[in-house]
Amino acid sequence: MNYTLSKRLCLTAMLTLAAVVYTTSAFAETSKLVIESGDSAQSRQEAAMEKEQWNDTRSLRQKVNTRAEKEWDKADAAFDNRDKCEQSANINAYWEPNTLRCLDRRTGRVITP
């Protein structure tokens, strides 16, 4: 009986020691988690700076878009004019690809098909 009691005491001591070691390691591994609303002074300042930069580049973006649109319109108009020139009833009309104009073979002047 004495042998069983010593076994139980030893087992209890080992479990207690294991529990202490486990809890101290658990305390050592915890970290602090802070959840912010995202409304700090730094984030507001960064947002204001990004908005200012976006507004400053707005005119440049509009100019680039306008230029691209004009170039596309010019190419589209030239394509339509080429079709009209090639389908023209005028035998002397030909399409000049370098100048994107319909010209008269005899005179070299611009004609409207």
UniProtKB/Swiss-Prot annotation:
InterPro entries, alphabetized: DUF1283
A Pfam match: DUF1283
Source organism phylogeny: Bacteria, Pseudomonadati, Pseudomonadota, Gammaproteobacteria, Enterobacterales
Keyword S-adenosyl-L-methionine appears in the UniProt entry: no
Keywords per UniProt: Signal
Gene from which the chain derives: ynfB
Family: Belongs to the UPF0482 family.
Signal peptide: 1-28
Domain of life: Bacteria
UniProt name for this protein: UPF0482 protein YnfB
TM helices/strands, residue ranges: none
